[in-house]
């Protein structure tokens, strides 16, 4: 019998229905933008009060601090709308239909709209529309100012991951090609021709470490303005400048808002004259440490492995459970009462018992107390809490598989930072997008994201990475499947409330029990279970003592029966131990049921029958126009003011016109070649020449010659204006 082909997985994507974003213009609608909307707004950020805590000083800072930081906030323009799921669904539909023609799909970009009316499409910055994630080309300082001032995102970002240049040798590490990560500073054929990058590089390094610190502080000020009160910022830096950058962040965020300095082990050590550097530093600051959102990360304990985790659980009980003995003594009163245990009275040698008299009795009944030579100890099992809290030393996150970018961050580092400081549906920002690691991680874990970069190469790589990514489909807590799974985990009836697939309700996470001494000591059900089983155990103990002429207490009864015991006595002994083990199992079950649980936020349950692709996102830029050329002092080089005879510009345009006169224009097909009968210069702002040629039917046609920049690309708006 022929085997039936397996059906493909269902393809889904996460959507953020309760989130929205401001309606901004696509590039082709630039001419419909009102003049006041085209003009960049000026956003002023207050400088830090110099009378506060000590701060870092660099060349020119005193002059800068005399006035607020003023940033131009130009409008943003959408260059491209991308919805991977819609594209995949369309391909599947076409493949299924075969050669059958299909009607035009008019709602391809419906997920991007959500506007109240058709007229609202051209009323920019006045309405909200459906949320879509964003990649933005431009200076991160201006972009962040525009997001805050024009789009109302001030105080709306939950987490920022900032991986700036480390400021070591002040060389260019801009990747010049999407197909090669080989970057050699000073090599002519690897020099970037992107004006945004050239300007960013010059602005950052024009004065060495002094301009670098100015670059960082300005962006940290703008980033803080975007953070919500419970928000976090993570800044990754090398050990060469971590002391300077931490001083900067103290200045911007306040010394009281430092959360942690995280040491991140790298894949390999950087060679040095003395000790090799094997770690980077991730500085974690909060907007307000008292309001900080924090989700504790954990790692699994393994018996015999890991200092402070599983290594000390070196003993086993009869059920093969790993355990270790820990102290029962605390430095805090009260708790200095005597305790009778196994026929002997005990007191704490120094300090106080960790629990009261009633609690101590329950610990004893639960089998959690053991006697040493001079004190009592508490038996802690490995599975009481089979995980341990991750500290600020991260040795398990090194490496970035399949690098496509010269400075690509390890995804595990970004993932842990995002999971610690945000929830599904929260907004994550990355001012230095690079290859899109932050976007990829945020997309995987259901966060909204905005990434910014000055490099077209970086955004092209990030765009391709997100478009082609596949993610696990995690069970939403606000879904029928999620409610069913939650009910199974908690042994309760599923909630009858309706579901809406709201991602802000989170996922259904794996969890581990967290059994503590306190939870056992306060578990009154242990007393009830103990009393119930005593009615069975005590008569059996008395029978055993009578038959063997013993006075054994419960803890003195041997585990194995002796060979010379009569069969009847051996049966009583076996019955007693059977009841004793059953009592312990019931007590252990009660302890586990009443213990707290800790969620493993990096281990949500997955629906294996579904696969997920990225949700809708847009590619945007600061301006639809090409970037103008500036001098070393940032003054604009205006070719129109310099006249049409400007050296270089005229030579390049004349060279193109001469080539067109001789070679014409060769299009895709040989028969579509255009040969000009006449071609002359044209004194226009956009058109550089006017030519005439014969069409296929012999009629005379006129063509305007539009010549783009010698170094750079032609924008869509320039083409539209030239065509008009």
Kindly label every feature range from the protein language model.
Residues 1-290, 373-724:
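S-adenosyl-L-methionine-dependent nucleic acid methyltransferase catalytic domains
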Residues 281, 287-393, 399-400, 415:
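Active-site-adjacent helix-turn-beta-strand microarchitecture at beta-sheet edges
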